Amino acid sequence: ASFDPHEKQLIGDLWHKVDVAHCGGEALSRMLIVYPWKRRYFENFGDISNAQAIMHNEKVQAHGKKVLASFGEAVCHLDGIRAHFANLSKLHCEKLHVDPENFKLLGDIIIIVLAAHYPKDFGLECHAAYQKLVRQVAAALAAEYH
């Protein structure tokens, strides 16, 4: 489903306020805390044995920033999300072997983090637009999976 002009405006207006490093690190940290079995993808990140270690792990924070920056690319390519993420989908499928369900889980956590940090901006319509965006990004990232 494509985005209408109002949805594009809502997504863009909020995105310009987002602290990508902080929110990205928090989102990935939350995923690793809430879903500890996902830590297996990050075993080379050092100590991720508990919530405190995860929240203060520089590699987790840096990768969270990278992930959210990549998510932000979708904001710039709302009319071509699937094509934009084709190579990243291939990487996650063929090389990293990441369970595509993780994209949905992390997308939901990103929404929680954005809502917590930007409550005045994250109203019902903005939430709906971001939910649509998260679904499309997750589907694009899962596109190479069979």
UniProtKB/Swiss-Prot annotation:
* Tissues where the protein occurs: Red blood cells.
Provide the binding site for heme b: 63, 92
Name the domain of life this protein comes from: Eukaryota
* Iron keyword on record: yes
Q: Which UniProt keywords apply?
A: Acetylation, Heme, Iron, Metal-binding, Oxygen transport, Transport
- List the GO terms this entry assigns under cellular component, sorted alphabetically: blood microparticle; haptoglobin-hemoglobin complex; hemoglobin complex
What InterPro entries does the annotation carry?
Globin (IPR000971), Globin-like_sf (IPR009050), Globin/Proto (IPR012292), Hemoglobin_b (IPR002337), Hemoglobin_oxygen_transport (IPR050056)
The PTM N-acetylalanine maps to 1
Q: What molecular function terms (GO) are annotated for this protein? A: haptoglobin binding; heme binding; metal ion binding; organic acid binding; oxygen binding; oxygen carrier activity; peroxidase activity
Domain Globin per the UniProt entry, residue ranges: 2-146
Q: Is Cell cycle one of the keywords UniProt gives this record?
A: no
| Pfam families, per database record | Globin (PF00042)
Q: Which GO terms describe its biological process?
A: hydrogen peroxide catabolic process
How does the record describe its quaternary structure? Heterotetramer of two alpha chains and two beta chains.
Q: What family is it from? A: Belongs to the globin family.
Q: PANTHER family from the xrefs? A: HEMOGLOBIN FAMILY MEMBER, HEMOGLOBIN SUBUNIT EPSILON
Q: What is the stated purpose of this protein?
A: Involved in oxygen transport from the lung to the various peripheral tissues.
Protein name (record):
Hemoglobin subunit beta
Its ancestry begins with: Eukaryota, Metazoa, Chordata, Craniata, Vertebrata
What's the name of its gene?
HBB
